[in-house]
Swiss-Prot record:
GO terms for molecular function: ribosome binding. This is Ribosome maturation factor RimM. The gene is rimM. Binds ribosomal protein uS19. Its main location: cytoplasm.
Length: 169
C-alpha cells in the first residue's frame, strides 16, 4: 500500500479531518467515492473508508468519510495515515514518476560524484524539490527541472544531475 496522507487533526464539529497530503495527486486521490485505508497510530490493521467530501482549506485537504458524522467519531483518527492499494495507482505519462519511485534513489553528478539518497520530495510551487541526504548527513536541495536533472533510471534507483553554479553551496 502507498501513503497518500497523514491526518493531523479534526476540523469543526461535523466529522471533517485535516490531512497533509503525501500524494502527487490529492484532487484525484481524495475524490468523492474513492476508497482509502486508515492505519491508526500504532495499528497495523487498516480500516476501509469511503470519501464523502473533499475540499481544500489553507495548506490542508479536508475530508469526510461515509458513516462518520461528528467530531467524536473521527478524533481517534488523529495521527493516522491514509493509504491506497497499488491497483489504485494510475498510469503516468512518459517521464513522470510517483514519489515512491523517486524516494530512495541515489543522486550522482554528471562527473560521477555520489551526492546521496533522496529522502523526501517538497512541493513548494513551480517545481518539486528533492531532499538529498549525503553520507555527511547534510541535506542538499535539488530542484526537479530539466536544466539540473539529466537522467532518471528507476530500475537502478539512480538519478544523474548536472550541478549548476551555486546549486550545492
Amino acid at each position: 500500500m502507498y501513503n497518500v496522507g497523514k491526518i493531523v487533526n479534526t476540523h469543526g464539529l461535523i466529522g471533517e479531518i485535516r490531512v497533509i497530503a503525501t500524494t502527487d495527486f490529492p484532487e484525484e486521490r481524495f475524490q468523492v467515492g474513492n476508497t482509502v485505508y486508515l492505519f491508526e497510530k500504532n495499528s497495523k490493521k487498516p480500516e476501509k473508508l469511503i470519501i464523502r467530501s473533499h475540499r481544500k482549506h489553507k495548506n490542508f485537504d479536508l475530508l469526510m468519510f461515509e458513516g462518520f458524522t461528528g467530531i467524536h467519531q473521527v478524533e481517534r483518527m488523529k495521527e493516522g495515515v491514509l493509504k491506497i492499494k497499488e491497483a489504485q495507482l494510475t498510469d503516468l505519462e512518459e517521464n513522470e514518476f510517483y514519489f515512491h519511485e523517486i524516494i530512495g534513489c541515489i543522486v550522482v553528478t554528471t562527473d560521477g560524484e555520489e551526492l546521496g539518497e533522496i529522502t523526501e520530495i517538497l512541493t513548494p510551487g513551480a517545481n518539486d524539490v528533492w531532499v538529498v541526504k549525503g553520507s555527511d548527513k547534510k541535506e542538499k536541495l535539488i530542484p526537479y527541472i530539466a536544466d539540473v536533472v539529466k537522467e532518471i533510471n528507476i530500475n537502478d534507483k539512480k538519478i544523474t544531475i548536472e550541478v549548476m553554479e551555486g546549486l550545492l553551496d
